[in-house]
Amino acid sequence: MFGAALAASAFGAKAQDGDVWAGHAVAREACRACHIVDPEARSPRIFEIGPAFHDIANIRGMTATAIRVFLTSSHPKMPNLILTPDEIADVTAYILSLRDHR
């Protein structure tokens, strides 16, 4: 089910929009200590600090630009991420792929 959701939402392998599959891999490595990154894991974890990626994707008005700005800015409750521009594009594409399709 998860693979089908990713495949359905992946528009291009590597474009300005980023690569959904690569973004999922980066998110699992760099983000899952504090966030729920997988769509099927929506229940709260004991040590969850940040919002689930599914919830971020479904914030009204959330855009790729907003996610990119967030990922390149420092935040007191979040470790400073050192991601390449491609990784930022990939994570952004992955997060946006988790939007509910209404």
Model-flagged regions — what are they?
Residues 1-9:
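Bacterial N-terminal signal peptides
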Residues 11-15:
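Sec/Tat signal peptide C-region and signal peptidase I cleavage site
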Residues 17-49, 98-102:
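Periplasmic/extracellular electron-transfer cofactor-ligation site
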Residues 21-25, 29, 65, 69, ...:
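Solvent-exposed, polar/charged alpha-helical surfaces in well-ordered, non-transmembrane soluble domains
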Residues 29, 48, 62-65, 73, ...:
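Extracytoplasmic
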Residues 39-68:
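Gly/Gly-Pro-rich "capping" loops immediately C-terminal to redox-active cysteine motifs
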Residues 42, 80-82:
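Surface-exposed patches in mature extracellular/periplasmic domains of secreted proteins
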Residues 75, 82-102:
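C-terminal capping alpha-helices of c-type cytochrome domains
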